Amino acid sequence: MFTPEDLDLFAEKGIDVHTVEEQLVSFKSGFPFLRILSSASVGNGILSLDEQQTQYYLDLWEGYLKDNHKVVKIVPASGAASRMFKDLFAFLSADYSEPQTDFEKKFFNSIEHFAFYSDLDEACLKNEGRSITDLIESGNYKAVVSNLLEAKGLNYGSLPKGLLKFHRYATNNRTAMEEHLTEGALYAASSDGEVNIHFTVSHEHLADFKALVAKKKVDYERRYGVRYHISFSEQKPSTDTIAVDANNEPFRENGRPLFRPGGHGALIENLNDIDAEIIFVKNIDNVVPDRLKEPTVRFKKIIGGVLVSLQTEINRYITMLKSGKYTIDDLREMIQFLHKKLFVRNEETKHLEDAELALYLLRKLNRPIRVCGMVRNSGEPGGGPFIAYNQDGTTSLQIWESSQIDMSNPDAKEQFESGTHFNPVDLVCAVRDNKGEKYDLPKYVDKNTGFISLKSKNGRELKALELPGLWNGAMSDWSTVFVEVPAETFNPVKTVNDLLRPQHQ
């Protein structure tokens, strides 16, 4: 099936032939729907904290930072912002020249409220010889939009979200990336003022990100009294996946198999390369101005404290199990911990001998840990928290997307629709074992949880394979705890007009 040239291409990308063959099998067989026991809710998989607990975990996190542990905040930031401007691209190509839709009218009626307004005004003066106000008054709306989106102006239609100006301040306006620098200083700084932030970016924008850091870093260090260690990585070519045609044969372009990026699940490799004890993960577009940051900072510290508490308890159990110094009562206590704290159950454990039970417990406890914030549903999109079945017969907490659930099954559909919370992508992860050794994170991926989607390339249809999502199947075999966090901590920017919401003004 593969030519010598194909094999050279695989080697160049660092992809094993066996991996490509596995992907082709996945296209033919598809991915199974995932079985749900129930949606997670407060009291059934989601922890809701009272004021006393909240203060306890806040103090725990502050104490952890004082001990100078290595904490890194990682921000996936490679996606282009083009979808943010979908409606404005449509306006540019429309057969009318003045705003018609509600979206278009809102954009132009409030244009001076965008953080990029003064930059856009400069671009219009330079390229059109007229200000935004003059262009709008003369009905030349499309010139304003083309200066926003195209390379002759701000080029926002091709830049990633991290480089776009999101928020206005009295002295300067901030990009999404700068808001993450601020956040890092507020909840992830060690006692001696070290802040580690890692951005995953696309190769074409790496230089732009580095230039912005070089320009702004010292200002933020002075403002917050910290020292930033800012690093970048790109998705590895070895995580690209092969595309196929309608017959599930490799899709070829000029005779060469076409590979596509494997989606955010590929970032488990980047996460695996990070030298840290604890890693925060948060999307690039979920940021707010300083006046609204308090709930975000507070709950980041709280979920950090929950993680530290869990890890301490789990490490104590792992040490006992590895040493062999435990009683039957200790094993019962660990089973209760699995049931009540981690919502991991397996009916077969009641039939196990003590030695087998100890091995089972070690397998379930000695793995990476994540604590995930969950927000009450209010119509916002996002995957959901579930208690789900795993391949080994256990049930545990998982984050699944709607496409992974069989909506033709009435029970599964009801479980999905009865969900009270959604996943805002608000994670904190412990990635070392009780001896401080790093876990090898790709070992904990469930390969049966990928996605297949239909795409096109130069007018030809193809099927693309996405790897198990970073917070979905890529962390399927992690110890997981869900904590309820307030809706104020979730303020994503999906369209340019979202920047006009009060949360971004």
Identify the function of each model-found stretch.
Residues 1-25:
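Intrinsically disordered, low-structural-confidence terminal and linker regions
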Residues 279, 389-424, 433, 449-454:
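C-terminal, active-site-flanking charged/polar segments
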Residues 7-11, 25, 29, 36-378, ...:
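Domain-scale recognition of functional cores that engage charged ligands
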Residues 131-138, 152, 156, 285, ...:
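Conserved catalytic alpha/beta cores of large enzymes that bind or transform nucleotide phosphates
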